[in-house]
């Protein structure tokens, strides 16, 4: 495998009711802020930055995060990630997350924007314990096109595997390939252009909680939203929308609901703009 275009490793632990870094390493195009503490729960907030401006042909990014026992961390990006044209190749990102006993990890980056002739692959592996918590979102949107076409990218290929006590509990593979089939058709994006996934794994998730979440959404007229439970205590939400703002509104509503009803915490503002 070629040398990474950017590397980011974060290792945190709980110390005196506060999450603190043990080791943080970043190299080349990937950078990260110092931990920021925005709430009263000792959670460490990190903002990932890409100094390269966007992903290009042959780029390879590696992000590895370890959340120790009882630690809490929230990780997001500074802004949307842009993937530009990748002729005869693709950009690759690999994510490996390790969540310890009674630990909580929230990974909610801004959307991935796919421009004309872009090809992108993402591989995500997450290793959890029975009483750890995961809140994860992933979203993809088309980039601006001079002729107003929605899908001018080559493909978006994202594979997520979640392991609970070393047992595979979630296998989620999304492949959007507008060069081979129309994404507007029923059963794929159905005339929508923006796609989002929100995954929650937490021991407090029940069928009643999922039912309550379904009825809590507001301003959903221009979207399609589906919720399914996982084989472990958790659920997956799919969102189809026409714009980023509507999709992120649902992400925020889901995030706030999970914080309040699963973690029994308030959701603190983490405004970036």
Swiss-Prot record:
Keywords attached to this entry: Chaperone, Cytoplasm, Nickel insertion
GO terms under cellular component: cytoplasm
Gene Ontology MF term list: nickel cation binding
Location of this chain's protein in the cell: Cytoplasm
Similarity comment: Belongs to the UreD family.
Subunit structure: UreD, UreF and UreG form a complex that acts as a GTP-hydrolysis-dependent molecular chaperone, activating the urease apoprotein by helping to assemble the nickel containing metallocenter of UreC. The UreE protein probably delivers the nickel.
Physiological role: Required for maturation of urease via the functional incorporation of the urease nickel metallocenter.
Designated name of the protein: Urease accessory protein UreD
Gene that this polypeptide is encoded by: ureD
């Amino acid at each position: 495998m070629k040398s990474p275009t950017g590397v980011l490793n974060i290792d945190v632990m709980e110390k005196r009711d506060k999450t603190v870094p043990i080791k943080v390493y970043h190299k080349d195009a990937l950078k990260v802020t110092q931990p920021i503490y925005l709430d009263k729960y000792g959670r460490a907030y990190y903002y990932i930055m890409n100094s390269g401006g966007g992903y290009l042909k042959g780029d390879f990014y590696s992000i590895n995060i370890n959340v120790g026992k009882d630690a809490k961390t929230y990780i997001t990006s500074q802004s949307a990630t842009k993937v530009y044209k990748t002729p005869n190749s693709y950009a690759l990102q690999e994510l490996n997350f390790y969540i310890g006993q009674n630990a909580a990890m929230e990974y909610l980056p801004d959307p991935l924007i796919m421009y004309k002739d872009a090809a992108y692959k993402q591989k995500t592996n997450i290793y959890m314990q029975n009483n750890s918590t995961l809140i994860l979102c992933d979203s993809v949107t088309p980039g601006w096109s001079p002729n107003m076409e929605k899908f001018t990218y080559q493909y978006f290929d994202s594979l997520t595997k979640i392991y609970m006590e070393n047992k595979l509990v979630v296998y989620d593979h999304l492949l959007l390939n507008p060069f081979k089939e129309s994404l507007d058709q029923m059963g794929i994006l159905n005339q929508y252009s923006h796609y989002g996934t929100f995954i929650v794994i937490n021991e407090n998730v029940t069928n009643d909680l999922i039912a309550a979440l379904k009825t809590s959404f507001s301003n959903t007229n221009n979207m399609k939203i589906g919720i399914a439970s996982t084989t472990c205590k958790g659920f997956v939400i799919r969102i189809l929308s026409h714009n980023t703002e509507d999709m992120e509104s649902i992400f925020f509503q889901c995030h706030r609901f999970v914080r309040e009803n699963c973690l029994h915490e308030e959701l603190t503002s983490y405004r970036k703009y």
